[in-house]
Amino acid sequence: MAESHYSPGQLIWLKLKRNRTAMFGLGVLVALYLSSFFAGFLAPAHYATQNREVSWHPPQLDDLHLFDAEGTFRGPFVYGTKRVHPAISEYEVEPGVVVELELFARGDTWSFFGLFESDLHLLGWSDPKRPIFLFGSDLYGRDLLSRVLYGSQISLSVGIIGILISMSLGMFLGGVAGYFGGRVDFALMRFIEVILSIPGLYLILTLRQAFGQDLPSTQSYFMIIIVLAFVGWAANARVVRGMVLSIKENDYVTAAEALGVSRVNIIRKHILPNTWSFAIVTATLYVPYYILSEVALSFLGVGIQEPEASWGNMLKDAQNIRNLTDYSWVLVPGFFIFLTTMAFNYLGDGLRDAADPRSKL
């Protein structure tokens, strides 16, 4: 069927589906955001649950078994471990002790965005005193798998909320500047230049110091989003302005003006919709910047604070060289940061190619 039979959105989707790397990135992001959304159910334990007796327990993902020593199928299980010495984080396997990995097990109570509470988890273990650490544990004996899942709620949502705010501001103010021109354009462009001169990360560091080290994690979370969105919209607005300067010269805009359509409706119905392809592609490519900014700030200790979990403050354990050499699983959050960034870049590149009117279906 000819391309003229499809809407612009359908054309972009059809082109995107043919890009395997872009679809791979989309699939990874869907999986990550779904697991983040249902983190309380998927996580075996609460992110703050501690057990100092099993601090720095190595990952047991490779130690999962399906058959016991006699060849009998038992489902997924691990052999129990015991600490070699109370002062040393070394463990030895107890072959005679079997700890089963259970599905739909009862455990710590979690809340689904304040709507309801439950203690049902997708994964659990048969012996509450012998937890199974698939990704290992940290200094306080907290399950890294659970903290990665809970941490994704903060790290992944920062990117989405931040880009929604910055793109909305950028498209609106850029559209206003480009359409009205004159003094409005001049004033907005000078304001944008001021915003572009503000270093976002340093502004957050300054505000964090001004508010003190006791700032709750919730307030730090919103401060990071607001500041990053405040300094991020200006670059988008400048690009949208340039697009609007070209779009407003089209015949359909002139016809709408001749028919007496209000300027606000012209911008909303005829101009901004023509910038959506740019907005979608830009948003996809910019989300990793917001995620990495939160990670960097939490890694430096000025973002999300303990005991809350975010991928950034989980990586703080990697600042210690001994931790890196002895407990390499502290880098597990880094793998998910890399995976997320890679997926967004793959998807963004695919969307950019699909939105290109010169590309063929």
Predicted regions mapped to residue ranges:
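Alpha-helical transmembrane segments of integral membrane proteins
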Residues: 137-361
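Gly/Trp-centered helix-boundary motif
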Residues: 1-167, 171, 260, 303, ...
